[in-house]
Amino acid sequence: MRLWPVLLLSAAAVPAAAQSASPPKLIVAISVDQLSSDVFDDYRPVLNGGFARLGRGTVFPHAYQGHAASETCPGHSTILTGAYPSRNGIIANTWYDLGQTRADKAVYCAEDERVAGSTSSAYTVSPWHLKVPTLGDYLKLQWPTSRTVAVAGKDRAAVMMSGQRPDQRWYWNGKTFATDLANAVVPQSVISARTAVAAQVAQPQAGLESPALCSAKAAVVPVGGGGAPVGAGRFVRAAGDATLFRASPEFDGATLALAAGLVREMKLGKSAAPDLLTVGLSATDYVGHRYGTEGQEMCLQMLSLDRDLGDFLAFLDREVGDYTVVLTADHGGKDIPERESAAGVAGAARVDPALSAGTMGKALGAKLGLAGTLLYGGNFGDIYVGRGLAPAQKAKVLAAALAAYRAHPQVEAVFTNDQLARTAIPVGTPDRWSLIQRARTSFDASRSGDFVVLLKKDITPIADTKGGYVSTHGSAWDYDRRVPIIFWRPGYPALTVDMPVQTVDILPTVAAMIGLAIPRGGIDGKCLSPAPGAVCVTE
């Protein structure tokens, strides 16, 4: 069942608009979580809804999230800041601050750990850790009456795309749409969305009808690590199951419906100053995590998302008229190793549990005769050496950890904090960057670990799948880094540009479309002149 209010279902498309010489009054920035270039390429020829329409804009099908830590928070932090994580401070979804006083040393990217009693899992949502302005922040500096509205399926997506001063920010908190803005007056559209979603979740969901394109992919695949088989699901859901609601096409429909309601209620795009709407569509990521990218489940998700995007654009045609859309993704993703192995991917495997920081730390403690937590982190990415050690002991632990990780057959590279600090921010196109250059753009000396571990290509860093996640992202490899970028505005010609541009290029490009001043030296991206209406100034 599609979750679209009557007001959206009645929104018919208007005739194609002529090319406008004036800047648009509404910028719509959409992130489709985990929409890799690979998935985009696979489905683009068969999609005839929203993606087909946006595809008649300027399409960069193989753009990049240049950094190594290809996770949701870092990815969203680049889209509307124009800055790498090394500049904006969002190096991962979670990092560690071993000097903080609370017992939980982990730090969630979109929390304010200064709040008493908070933890990295029971946190106060905040943009506290984002070090740079977003597009919405820049808009308010130049046009104080400009409004920024954010809607997303994840709090970190909403926060990182809307920045410090949004007028409305709403995200799914696991139960309903919530906000972190103090003393916020809840719009009627949010009240309606909450009621509609609660009623939707309370009803069971029968399996979706599967067209031939998707049913051809419906092969059951056993999953290692204790998880349930995947591949032939059709999003059957019991009444009240909000977890499966989130990992289904229903979720993006609800997010877009709320976004449309706020556009109408707030009359976005109808004032003198340009407005910004950011939309974080998270279902593709949850579907990829639970089922992988090559089964019937992802096929049904992509077809549904295409249809819902088409409805949303038709609504904007009627409600706003002249607007511009930029669509991209926070990161890519890959399929489950079991299905990849069957397809002939020789190196596809699940990570060795011995690589987790906790397990490795215990092994090193036994070897070195040291007690306590020696290592903090996951089974890849930033690893931190415990602080409760004498300098000589810490040096021994670091040396032993580096040797152990580097010797492991699933590890491609290990770079120390010192190595990364000495490495220059890369120039040139991101498809040519070395691994250490990719890691450098994810490095912040005040937040990064003592060293970073990069796994070999096609290693899936999930060993235990009993919790429901069977696949993930986060690597420095191109299947996780490559994403599409689409710029669209009514009346401009279609253009596909197969160049390795980056998501950090979006901010300066949009700024060039609307005449927005961006301080020199404050960003890492560059203006993309093929984008519709972008007047790029070369210095």
Over which residues does each language-model region extend?
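N-terminal signal peptide c-region/cleavage motif recognized by signal peptidases
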Residues: A13-A16
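Beta-strand elements within well-structured catalytic alpha/beta cores of enzymes
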Residues: P24-S36, R53-L54, I79, L139, ...
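Secreted, luminal/periplasmic, and some membrane-associated catalytic domains
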Residues: H62, A69, N93-T124, Q164, ...
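His/Asp/Glu-rich, glycine-adjacent segments
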Residues: Y84, I90-A273, S282-H289, A407-P409, ...
